[in-house]
Design a protein with these regions (language model features):
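Acidic, metal/ion-coordinating pockets
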Residues: 2-214
Length: 214
């Protein structure tokens, strides 16, 4: 113990101490892809809209910032479809309860199922997020919105969130006049990151990328 204390003291003298400040530490929880559809939706119909979050929800909510990459749109009238060949996904608006219980602060929209029920349904889902105070990035009402960074500050640290989708298909990507995910473009992402750093808009830049179906 004495040797460790001596080592720590000498290390501090050599490096000039530490810049660690507990008051500025931020816990960021990023879950990866969420899709409340098919078998998950079936279980939610049986056990309630908060079922997926009953165990993990409080843990996620304890973070300073909680992020969900939500793969599918919220669609009024969405029906549970368990068919193995069904690849058109949606979630009932009531399923938002699981995200609320999980303390979700930010929604990543880099998935390729946002437009499965059409562009109008995708727009309605975006409006639903806004109505419930959930900011989105990596997707949006059009290409400009999809590529726009989302900024958030926690405990004195400024974060910038960006996202894009490499996999497609093309109807899943946002254009100048339709919603969707941001189509991966290294040039756009690189320029955006440079701009953020040059303008000192964030301390940490996080980029979410959906590659293939992962």
């Amino acid at each position: 113990a004495n040797q460790l204390a001596l080592f720590t003291q000498k290390l501090a003298q050599t490096t000039g101490g530490t810049n660690r400040d507990a008051a500025q530490l931020t816990v960021l929880a990023m879950t990866g892809v969420t899709a409340m559809t098919r078998q998950t939706a079936y279980q939610m119909e049986l056990f309630g809209s908060e079922w997926p979050a009953e165990v993990v929800g409080p843990e996620l909510a304890a973070a300073d910032i909680t992020h969900i990459s939500n793969e599918v749109p919220f669609v009024a009238g969405c029906k549970v479809n368990l068919a193995e060949d069904n690849f058109n996904f949606c979630s009932k608006p009531s399923y938002l309860d699981s995200l609320t219980l999980s303390g979700v602060d930010i929604i990543g929209l880099t998935g390729n199922h946002q437009n499965d029920f059409g562009y109008d349904a995708a727009r309605d889902s975006l409006a639903f997020y806004e109505e419930n105070g959930l900011p989105v990035y990596g997707g949006g009402i059009d290409k400009t919105a999809a590529f726009a960074p989302y900024y958030r500050t926690a405990n004195g640290t400024r974060f910038a969130f960006l996202g894009a989708n490499m996999y497609g298909p093309s109807f899943a990507w946002a254009t100048d006049n339709r919603p969707g995910s941001a189509e991966y473009d290294l040039g756009i992402l690189s320029a955006t990151i440079r701009s953020i750093k040059e303008k000192n808009l964030a301390d940490v830049v996080l980029v979410e990328l959906q590659w293939q179906e992962s």
